[in-house]
């Protein structure tokens, strides 16, 4: 809601603590998974702080999400911490604004059309099956780093081309690059940010070689790079080389980091709930799955859909996001000043007991047709964000999650090894502190 400047000035700014000069509470934010929860308990559901040198107001809940997501470009515009903006690059969809963002989103969406996703399925399935075969031979697995390799292999194959995924340098460079995305922007050789900048330069140089090689080959739209090379903007011009590099790097990040977190959470939660694991298996047994999985077969698993929705609710791969206020406004009796940032909290929304009774419980029954979650208001379940900036690849993520879950449940049972720390590290995406050590039991 927008009110007159006079009325706004009479409203209080939300309570909170700015912390240290410039730095504010950045270190606590990066290192404490309960940062938002603790401050909500202290100050209430809307509070202020300072992060990365910026004043920030935290909000959560379905109503707050609706307020933010429906006022994009009117009251809010997308923004990222400085380190993230620099490392994603000026030509990545995530950092583009206005008409350029609209135009590029339309182009990139071609890589995630239903027919395109269907065409990805055989290669995705082959990669997943290959990793499952490796893990079965190993018996005991430290799962999280293995999941990272698998999702990167899928992303590199489907976004850049099959041969590229065999380049042994890409994965370690990419791991270093990701570690600095949400860091303090200090460009020194031994800082996370400095190391990430160097890794980004190496990745961009390699991407340039790949793109130039593809430009010499016959056109092919079998992967995202081929689609982007064939695309034309609103002026009927091809995308520039700098933009192609930034967009592909963004796709690799988006199709790898958060997906790994989601798959890890699935493995963790179903490892802790054998009854739910068995019910998923029973649903599969009724379908008599063949060697080749199709998109139509995957659509016939409503209980698995519920399980995945609950995984994304309980441990969302992205804890929240940022918007910048481009004009003063008010929300729930507080003044939100122009130039400040607003952070919407996915984790806190998903833990709201008014939306999800007993929110700490893993309960897929919430998402049955008559379950409590199906009666929630819009923007109560937002694992992929919302509005104009909703995750473009959300259906790609759902497809990979569902395919992986299906093949895993079909071929293996698993137990979590004792003596490990399952507490979640939250930056940049949630993962168990000891990387999820498991013992696999083959069912084939």
UniProtKB/Swiss-Prot annotation:
Enumerate the cofactors the protein uses: heme
User: If you read the UniProt record, what top EC class would you report for this enzyme, in one word?
Assistant: oxidoreductase
* Residues where heme binds: 391
EC annotation from Swiss-Prot or TrEMBL = 1.14.-.-
Q: Name one GO molecular function term.
A: heme binding
Which key words tag this protein in UniProt? Heme, Iron, Metal-binding, Monooxygenase, Oxidoreductase
Where are its TM segments located?
none
Which PANTHER family does this UniProt record tie to the protein? CYTOCHROME P450 26, P450, PUTATIVE (EUROFUNG)-RELATED
> In which family does this protein belong, per the annotation?
Belongs to the cytochrome P450 family.
What is the protein name given in its UniProt record?
A: Putative cytochrome P450 120
